[in-house]
């Protein structure tokens, strides 16, 4: 056992609970485990000794209540509460024990303990009810005491004990019964005579001084809270409190101390006595403290409490006898007024009452004068004084002056001293420059003017004017001057107001006060006192709001002549439309200034002002250019309202259309008055308005469409209830527009027809030629119609036609996404589809419209709405038609059963129209389309059919349809556009071919069935696919046929051989570079066709080109490199020095794009380039050929790799780099080849191609990386290391791990470190080669180490150098490098001589030994080394002896 465990065990054994358990097991009792054994429990031993025995669990809990740690006491109280709630039989005995601890717990140093104690008491009283009465004497006094606890939570819990523990009628009785004990307890604690004043020896929560202060405060609060609650109803508190005040030693000690809170509490208690003055005066220290605290500067309550006491004492003669009013209180009062400090916060409330009492007792006329003049003594204020105190000083002065002037009994001689005092206080208010101080003094002046109490007001206002102009600086006097002139009605202030306005730099508020003057007499008097009006002429300094006030002033005095500018004042004057101002100031203003004003309002989008100004100027004969404001709603509304009813209706309609466009195009929400103004002008015909609006909408956001719909609803909602439906019907989509728009979308119905599993409906439109739009044009159209559909269905005034249109557009958007499936659907179209799906509903009315043939493009609706199958009626009726239609709509349990039934019908006398293509007979097309759709559903189950004739018939049907379609399409390249149903049928049969091919690869079908499919049907269908490919054009759109052909071509693994040279080569493009290789005519035409399609702007067409070029690449490579692929390794001597080199197929280089318009073509061609390296067996590659081919493609590879980087699924411009590869999908992107068309096709293709390049050409990738600009290298390394290198290292290690080596060669891998360790035992000696792959492989070179070489060191180093060169420069694979190293070791041990040119045994490229022997010197050479010697020296002699080899 560890020391720590022993300590834990000892601690457990030391606990009282564990000890009791051990003793009980041994037969001992609890006797002997007394509190004396714990030094912290002695205090409770006496209490616990006298009560009845309690159970062990309760005793443990009780022990916790006396522990020194407050957390233990808290835990004990919580456990006790749980015991009380468990209905324990020992609750009563627990209660008796607890009562003995209440005194300690209710005064505990921890607030939590005190609060929990109150809750425990409350639980005991609730549980025990009457049984708890015997302990109330010990509990209730402390509960009442706790109601005054300094912690609010404890006080609230104590109040809850009384509230919840007793009935309502007994609460008062309980309080009165036990409160005397509480008062005695409180008095003793306050005097320090109670044992609870000292901290309990078990309580470590607070120190002595803190506990004493808390309990003393709580004790005095006990008296005050009782007095506050019961007031004069009870005097139970007086006797204990009087004893407290009779203890002169205690009172002196308290007031001599520094505990101001206790002093304030004692003062408040003394004020509550019925003979309070006698109690106060009996303790001189109290009255002394009161007088001394009248100017206390603290923010506590002692100052206010002292003033309460002085107001109690002042009227009483007994106080006068002990303290002279004339010599003591009066001088003290003057000092308090003269002193400028924080005590003014209190003095504000008590000065007037005190002075009033003092005046009654002292008949001294000079008293008031002394007091009022003392206000301005001892200035300036103390720096530490608060602004609140200063504001109180101002308010007190104002109230004092009003009190003096409003009291007739006071000598009016003081009036002569008031004027300078008020002026001085005005100076002080300007000095402090606060709103509160200014309002106090200016309000006093206004009051004095109203009361007319000044004998010489002119002199007073002269002093005031001098003070404003000369004493205070301008920035300080502005607020006071504004406040003084604000009412603008007292004529006494008009002279002052006029003088203030005569200053050119006068504050705007002074001007505003005059403009707002309601008293015309005051306005005229003020204007007479204005010396000049420069303050208005300098109009540039006023802002827009100020300009309104200035114009008011000018309108009140239109005689003023002003210079008008394009500023706020000038524009406001123009909008006033005042003829007097026009004649005086505006008439001669140049028109250019007015145009500038209009342009300004246009920038601020204030159309209302533009219209108002333009109309006014038009009346005055001035025309302005308003084109800039043509889209402003307020401007247009104002113009519309100003139109005369007799004017041209067409002009009115155009204006309404402009207004509608502006209203719905506005970014901000139009105002309600805009809708109100427009509602009366909606009587015209605006049916195509929203169609044009959405066609020209620049914002690509479905939310914007919803905003427009909400505005439309709001607009129509302002119209009369009876006309709303009619107006809405005129403006939004109608039946005719719905049909027209459905007609536009027919080119996408073909996409629905070929994928939908619902009933096919053959409409007249599908029998007519279809013009397929380009991607941008198609997307733009679908967006416009989608917006219109969302608007219509989102409006509250939508109908079933709008719902039908919305259902249709949901499928149209999906069809567009399917057509251009290599890209993600446009974000706005996604939003439109989501919003439409939220709002469409199904109803009987919509169902009826569909059944009645309301929809022109029903296949859209049937695919989304899911209507019940309804048999189509055909015009071409014959007697056997019913039977045929019955077969078409036949219900079967399985698709295979349906196909079989149709087969039987086709063999009957009625000759069911299968594989017949009469364009005029719709039912034949319906039969064929329905059949092939069910056949696709059937899938590989056809191979399980027991009826061989049925199976052969259906499979031969595929060949029949494709043969017919191919012949028709070759004869007429545009036949699919002219006959959409033929395209649909061909598409479905190509899909069927793909489905059946996949089924044979995955399904468990008989070998005979699969073999028959692969050997007979598949080659023929492959031939038709290639022939169909020959009809593809560069400008062709990705229609269902194009997409299906692409899927079918990706299924083909090699180019078909069953073609004659004359097949489909009539229109072959002649390419001189190809003609030199003498390709078969058909192959040459396919090559030319495939590589020409790479120039298409359509990605599906590019992929079709890639899919066919992928099949042709092995043929091209072998034919164009036929001479170079012939191996010369078996000949003894390479006599000829003109050996042919490998080359890249000519069409790959020729087809590489010269610009970046088609970014995917480069990577597609790069993948074709790597095919010979991927399939070395099919290409006839030797190691020498491989190295040579890598050298040949190097320039092309670097160029194509740059294009490949652009296609990678990374956002290199983001910080950090963004990745489009989903989490945990790295393997699917880098290791799996996925040729299914989807929006992530090129992301996956580029990722896989990069990984393939890293695998096949690691050295080329490394050199590409090293040649990158420095700014791109970290980004490339980060992405490769994070996503690809890990998988590549894992793949390389896997190849080595699965490889089998001959002899004593053992190879193991260490995946954690990326190491490969090759151990080779030769002649009982073990050699160890370690290859370490770095984390960013192949960007960094693997590390190579060799231990215990059995040959000379220089030779072992040569092997390592050769291996390093192979891996670093020649794109060698790790596994091949290990095998090369092993051959070097083997031949070195066998004694094989080195080639005397390269000085190596095994050739680095061909992995062959030196075989070519010189007849003269007998030295042997590698054939490749000798060939390079011949080529570089331009002669055929031995490099050593110079003997001629030829």
UniProtKB/Swiss-Prot annotation:
Q: How does it assemble?
A: Component of the ribosome quality control complex (RQC), composed of at least the E3 ubiquitin ligase ltn1 and nemf. The complex probably also contains tcf25 as well as vcp/p97 and its ubiquitin-binding cofactors. RQC forms a stable complex with 60S ribosomal subunits.
List GO molecular-function terms, semicolon-separated: ribosomal large subunit binding; ubiquitin protein ligase activity; zinc ion binding
Q: What class of enzyme is it?
A: transferase
Q: Where in the cell? A: Cytoplasm, Cytosol
Query: InterPro entries under this entry?
Result: ARM-like, ARM-type_fold, LTN1/Rkr1, LTN1_HEAT_5th, LTN1_UBC, RING-CH-C4HC3_LTN1, Znf_RING, Znf_RING/FYVE/PHD
- HEAT repeat boundaries on the chain: 71-108, 115-153, 324-361, 363-399, 413-450, 630-669, 684-721, 1046-1083, 1107-1144, 1165-1202, 1251-1289
Q: What family does this chain come from, according to its entry?
A: Belongs to the LTN1 family.
Q: Name one GO cellular component term.
A: RQC complex
Pathway where it operates:
Protein modification; protein ubiquitination
Instruction: Quickly give the catalysed reaction.
Output: S-ubiquitinyl-[E2 ubiquitin-conjugating enzyme]-L-cysteine + [acceptor protein]-L-lysine = [E2 ubiquitin-conjugating enzyme]-L-cysteine + N(6)-ubiquitinyl-[acceptor protein]-L-lysine
Under what name is this protein listed? Answer: E3 ubiquitin-protein ligase listerin
Q: Which SUPFAM superfamilies match?
A: ARM repeat, RING/U-box
User: Which residue numbers delimit the RING-type Zn fingers?
Assistant: 1395-1442
Q: Do the record's keywords include RNA-binding?
A: no
Q: Which UniProt keywords apply?
A: Cytoplasm, Metal-binding, Repeat, Transferase, Ubl conjugation pathway, Zinc, Zinc-finger
Keyword Cell inner membrane tagged: no
């Amino acid at each position: 056992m560890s020391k720590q465990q022993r300590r834990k065990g000892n601690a457990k054994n030391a606990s009282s609970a564990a000890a009791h358990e051990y003793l009980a097991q041994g037969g001992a009792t609890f006797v002997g485990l007394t509190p004396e054994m714990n030094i912290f429990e002695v205090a409770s031993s006496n209490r616990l000794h006298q009560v009845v025995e309690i159970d062990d669990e309760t005793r443990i809990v009780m022990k916790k209540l006396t522990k020194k740690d407050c957390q233990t006491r808290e835990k004990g109280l919580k456990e006790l509460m749980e015991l009380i709630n468990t209905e324990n039989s020992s609750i009563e005995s627990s209660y008796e024990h607890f009562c003995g601890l209440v005194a300690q717990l209710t005064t505990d140093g921890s607030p939590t303990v005190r609060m929990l104690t109150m809750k425990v008491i409350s639980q005991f009283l609730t549980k025990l009810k009457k049984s708890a009465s015997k302990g109330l004497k010990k509990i209730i006094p402390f509960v009442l005491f706790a109601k005054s606890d300094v912690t609010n939570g404890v006080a609230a819990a104590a109040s809850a004990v009384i509230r919840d523990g007793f009935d309502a009628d007994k609460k008062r009785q309980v309080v009165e019964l036990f409160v005397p004990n509480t008062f005695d307890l409180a008095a003793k604690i306050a005097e320090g005579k109670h044992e609870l004043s000292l901290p309990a020896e078990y309580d470590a929560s607070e120190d002595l001084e803190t506990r004493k202060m808390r309990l003393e405060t709580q004790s005095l609060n006990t008296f005050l809270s009782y007095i506050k609650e019961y007031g004069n109803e009870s005097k139970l508190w007086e006797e204990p409190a009087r004893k407290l005040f009779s203890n002169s030693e205690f009172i002196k000690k308290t007031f001599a101390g520094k505990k101001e809170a206790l002093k304030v509490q004692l003062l408040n208690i003394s004020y509550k006595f019925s003979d309070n003055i006698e109690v106060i005066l009996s303790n001189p220290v109290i009255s002394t403290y009161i007088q001394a605290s009248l100017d206390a500067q603290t923010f506590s309550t002692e100052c206010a409490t002292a003033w309460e006491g002085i107001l109690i004492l002042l009227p009483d003669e007994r106080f006068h006898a002990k303290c002279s009013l004339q010599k003591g209180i009066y001088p003290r009062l003057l000092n308090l007024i003269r002193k400028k400090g924080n005590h003014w916060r209190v003095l504000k409330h008590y000065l007037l009452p005190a002075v009033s009492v003092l005046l009654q007792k002292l008949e001294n006329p000079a008293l008031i004068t002394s007091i009022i003049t003392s206000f301005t003594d001892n200035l300036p204020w103390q720096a530490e004084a608060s602004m609140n105190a200063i504001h109180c000083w101002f308010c007190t002065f104002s109230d004092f002056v009003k009190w003096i002037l409003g009291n007739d009994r006071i000598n009016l001689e003081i009036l002569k001293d008031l004027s300078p005092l008020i002026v001085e206080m005005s100076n002080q208010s300007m000095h402090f420059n606060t709103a509160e101080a200014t309002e106090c003094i200016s309000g006093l002046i206004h009051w004095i003017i109203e009361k007319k109490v000044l004998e010489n007001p002119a002199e007073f206002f002269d002093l005031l004017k001098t003070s404003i102009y000369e004493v205070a600086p301008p920035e300080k006097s502005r607020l006071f001057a504004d406040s003084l002139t604000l009412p603008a009605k007292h004529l006494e202030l008009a002279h002052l107001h006029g003088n203030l306005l005569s200053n050119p730099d006068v504050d705007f508020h002074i001007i505003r006060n005059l403009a707002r003057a309601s008293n015309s007499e005051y306005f005229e008097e003020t204007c007479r006192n204005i010396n000049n009006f420069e303050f208005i002429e300098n109009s540039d300094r006023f802002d827009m709001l100020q300009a309104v006030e200035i114009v008011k002033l000018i309108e009140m005095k239109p005689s003023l002549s002003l210079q008008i500018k394009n500023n706020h004042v000038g524009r406001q004057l123009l909008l006033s439309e005042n003829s007097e101002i026009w004649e005086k100031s505006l008439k001669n203003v140049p028109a250019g200034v007015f145009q500038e004003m209009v342009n300004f309002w246009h920038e601020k989008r204030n159309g209302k002002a533009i219209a108002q100004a333009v109309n006014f100027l038009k009346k005055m004969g001035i025309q302005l250019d308003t084109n800039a404001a043509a889209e402003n709603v307020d401007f247009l509304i104002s113009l519309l309202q100003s139109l005369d009813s007799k004017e041209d209706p067409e002009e009115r309609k155009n204006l309404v259309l402009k207004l509608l466009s502006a209203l719905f195009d506005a970014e901000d929400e139009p105002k309600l008055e805009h809708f109100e103004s427009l509602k009366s002008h909606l009587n015209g015909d605006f049916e195509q308005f929203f169609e044009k609006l959405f066609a020209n909408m620049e914002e690509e956001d479905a939310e914007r469409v919803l905003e427009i719909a909400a505005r439309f609803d709001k607009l129509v909602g302002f119209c009369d209830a009876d006309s709303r439906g009619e107006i809405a019907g005129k403006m939004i989509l109608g039946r005719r527009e719905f049909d027209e728009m459905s007609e536009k979308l027919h080119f996408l119905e073909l996409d629905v027809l070929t994928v939908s599993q619902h009933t096919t409906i053959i409409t007249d439109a599908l029998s007519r030629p279809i013009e397929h739009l380009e991607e941008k044009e198609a997307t733009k159209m679908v967006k416009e119609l989608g917006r219109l559909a969302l608007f219509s269905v989102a409006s509250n005034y939508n109908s079933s036609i709008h719902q039908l249109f919305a259902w249709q557009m949901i499928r149209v958007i999906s069809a567009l996404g399917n057509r251009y499936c290599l890209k993600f659907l446009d974000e706005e179209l996604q939003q439109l589809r989501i919003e439409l799906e939220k709002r469409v509903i199904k109803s009987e009315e919509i169902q009826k419209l569909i059944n009645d043939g309301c929809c022109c493009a029903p296949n859209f609706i049937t695919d989304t709405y899911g209507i019940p199958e309804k048999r189509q009626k055909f015009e071409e009726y014959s007697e056997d038609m019913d039977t045929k239609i019955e077969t078409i709509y036949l219900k079967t349990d399985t698709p295979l059963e349906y196909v079989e039934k149709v087969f039987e019908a086709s063999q009957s006398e009625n000759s069911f129209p299968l594989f017949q293509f009469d364009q005029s007979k719709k039912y034949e097309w319906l039969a064929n389309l329905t059949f092939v759709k069910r056949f696709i559903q059937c899938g590989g189950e056809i191979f399980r059919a027991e009826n061989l004739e049925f199976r052969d018939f259906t499979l031969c049907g595929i060949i029949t349809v494709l043969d017919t379609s191919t012949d028709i399409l070759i004869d007429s390249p545009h036949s699919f556009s002219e006959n959409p149903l033929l395209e649909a049928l061909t598409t479905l049969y190509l899909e069927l071919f793909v489905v059946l091919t996949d089924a044979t690869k995955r399904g468990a079908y008989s070998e005979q069935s699969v073999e028959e499919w692969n050997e007979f049907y598949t080659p023929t269908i492959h031939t038709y696919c290639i022939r169909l490919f020959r009809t593809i054009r560069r400008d062709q759109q990705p229609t269902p046929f194009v997409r299906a052909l692409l899927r079918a071509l990706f299924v083909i693994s090699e180019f078909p051989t069953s073609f004659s040279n004359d097949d489909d080569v009539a229109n072959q493009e002649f390419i001189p570079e190809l003609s030199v290789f003498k390709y078969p005519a058909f192959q040459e035409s396919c090559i030319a066709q495939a590589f020409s399609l790479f120039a298409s702007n359509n990605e599906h067409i590019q992929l079709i080109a890639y899919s066919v070029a992928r099949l042709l690449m092995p043929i091209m490579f072998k034919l164009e490199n036929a001479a170079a692929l012939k191996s010369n390794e078996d000949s003894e001597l390479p006599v000829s020095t003109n050996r042919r080199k490998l080359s890249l197929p000519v069409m790959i280089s020729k087809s590489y794009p010269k610009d970046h318009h088609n970014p995917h073509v480069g990577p597609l061609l790069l993948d074709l380039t790597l095919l010979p390296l991927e399939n070395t067996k099919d290409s006839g590659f030797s190691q020498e050929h491989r190295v040579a081919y890598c050298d040949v493609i190097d320039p092309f590879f670097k160029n194509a790799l740059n294009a490949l980087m652009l296609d990678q699924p990374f956002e290199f411009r983001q910080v950090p780099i963004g990745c489009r590869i989903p989490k945990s999908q790295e393997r699917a992107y880098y290791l799996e080849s996925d040729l299914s068309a989807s929006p992530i096709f090129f992301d996956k293709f580029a990722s896989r191609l990069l990984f393939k390049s890293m695998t096949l050409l690691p050295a080329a990738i490394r050199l590409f990386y090293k040649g990158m600009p420095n700014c791109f290298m970290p980004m490339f390394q980060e992405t490769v290391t994070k996503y690809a290198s890990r998988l590549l290292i894992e793949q390389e290690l896997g190849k080595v791990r699965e490889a089998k080596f001959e002899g004593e060669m053992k190879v193991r891998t260490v995946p954690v470190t990326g190491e490969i360790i090759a151990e080779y035992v030769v002649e009982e000696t073990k050699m160890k080669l370690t290859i370490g792959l770095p984390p960013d492989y192949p960007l960094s070179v693997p590390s190579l180490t060799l231990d215990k070489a059995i040959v000379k060191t220089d030779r072992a180093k040569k092997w390592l150098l050769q291996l390093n060169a192979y891996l670093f420069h020649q794109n060698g694979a790790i596994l091949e490098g290990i095998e090369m190293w092993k051959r070097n070791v083997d031949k070195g041990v066998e004694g094989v001589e080195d080639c005397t040119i390269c000085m190596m045994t095994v050739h680095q490229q061909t992995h062959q030994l030196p075989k070519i022997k010189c007849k003269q010197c007998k030295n042997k050479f590698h054939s490749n080394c000798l060939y390079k010697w011949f080529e570089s020296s331009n002669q055929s002699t031995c490099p050593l002896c110079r003997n001629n080899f030829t």
